[in-house]
Design a protein with these regions (language model features):
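Extended, hydrophobic/aromatic-rich amphipathic alpha-helical segments that build helical scaffolds
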Residues: 1-29, 76, 140-148, 213-239, ...
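An aromatic- and glycine-enriched ligand-binding surface/loop that stacks and positions planar moieties
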Residues: 1-167
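Extracellular/surface-associated beta-sandwich interaction domains
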Residues: 12-17, 24-28, 34, 187-196, ...
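Acidic surface patches and DE-rich sequence motifs
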Residues: 29, 184, 241, 311
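Alpha-helical junction/boundary sensor with strong preference for TPR arrays
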Residues: 31, 243-246
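Long, intrinsically disordered, low-complexity segments
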Residues: 45-105, 206-216, 237-240, 248-344
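Coil residues (strongly favoring Ser/Thr
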Residues: 108, 185-186, 313
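Flexible, polar/acidic helix-loop-strand segments at domain edges
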Residues: 124-217
Length: 344
């Protein structure tokens, strides 16, 4: 882990690497969870309402496992409500990750990004990541299952819509708004979130009607964690086999790290993996110079001195001085956040 120790203290003793490996093995053998057969059916874009009009899903005969207990790969998830409304206590009941990470667009009812819906345009996928993936695993089915390439899937995509920044033409499609095509009695076509089919009374506001579960832990992560701790290949190979890839014959840290990168892409784990491997600064620095557009202006990504920033701070945020004061000095400021000339 981050602290490079074989054991860490707990309230009633210590927790060792061997203890964690044993817990993971128990989960693998006795939990009832398992890898589901098709990686692509884990994600809502394969839902039955979107499927007929989304060629990628229809041509591959995909069928969503859903979120009602049939998906035995999901171990722990965060559920969301169909009752979100605009007030301080209820707006958060919808999945705002989907909202943040869907493309910007001026009209939520258009076909431009289908099946992707409209959102706030955060987190376009880096071409550098796709190049790495293509080079490492050219036949990996998870790449197209995870990334929406507008050049391939959206001929009517509008670049620079609603002043989109950091635009690469690549969007992740694991956690984003997913639309369905709706044709009324007069033959008029519109598009709306698939949640409107599951819960017809849900608010039509695209900022309130994303209800996809956030999966915090799934079984493939358990398998990969066990392989990492035990330096064995069985977990890695189970994940690779499902993705249509050749099994590896010997464990290596590089193979494990790549497998986590591809299998768990866009699921909120990569940053913490990079931190605990002490690779975050180098990985972020590689994004310098990556091509993208800001509101139709061609630019390149500028991460500046991000490697030094991560080195100085260890990747940790600044502890608010008010909290340090309240602790009467028990809390100490994180490294890299002291002095009169803070860079960050």
């Amino acid at each position: 882990g981050y602290y490079q120790k074989e054991a860490l203290p707990t309230l009633d003793g210590t927790l060792s690497k061997a203890d964690v490996a044993a817990l993971l093995k128990d989960c693998i053998d006795h939990s009832g969870h398992k890898l589901m057969p098709d990686f692509r059916n884990l994600w809502p874009y394969s839902n039955p309402y979107t499927a007929p009009d989304y060629p990628y899903v229809a041509s591959n005969h995909l069928s969503w496992y859903g979120e009602d207990g049939a998906n035995l790969e999901t171990i722990f998830m965060i559920k969301y409500s169909s009752k979100a409304v605009w007030d301080n206590s209820n707006a958060h009941r919808n999945n705002q990750v989907d909202l943040y990470f869907s493309p910007r667009e001026t009209d939520s009812s258009t076909e431009n990004n289908f099946p992707l819906g409209i959102g706030w345009g955060f987190g376009p996928v880096s071409p550098a990541m796709i190049n790495d993936w293509q080079t490492a695993e050219p036949t990996d089915l998870r790449r197209k299952a995870s990334v929406f390439d507008v050049a391939d899937e959206a001929p009517n995509y509008v670049w620079g819509a609603d002043k989109q920044y950091n635009e690469t033409g690549l969007w992740q499609k694991k956690y984003c708004a997913i639309n369905v095509k709706v044709t009324d009695a007069s033959g008029n076509v519109s598009y709306e979130n698939y949640s409107r089919k599951l819960y017809p009374g849900i608010d039509p506001d695209y900022q309130l009607n994303n209800i996809q579960d956030i999966v915090v832990l799934r079984f493939s992560d358990i398998l990969l964690m066990y392989s990492e701790l035990t330096h064995t290949v069985d977990g890695i190979n189970a994940v690779r086999t499902r993705a249509g890839l050749t099994p590896i014959t010997a464990y290596s840290d590089n193979a494990l790290r790549n497998e986590r990168r591809w299998e768990l892409a866009f699921e909120g784990l990569r940053w913490y993996d990079l931190l605990r491997w002490h690779m975050a600064g180098d990985a972020l620095a590689r994004e310098n110079g990556v091509p993208m557009q800001d509101n139709l202006e061609q630019k390149t990504m500028d991460m500046s001195d991000i490697r030094q920033r991560v080195t100085d701070t260890g990747g940790f945020l600044q502890i608010p001085q008010t909290q340090i004061d309240l602790s009467n000095g028990v809390l100490k400021q994180n490294p890299g956040w002291t002095g009169d000339n803070l860079l960050y």
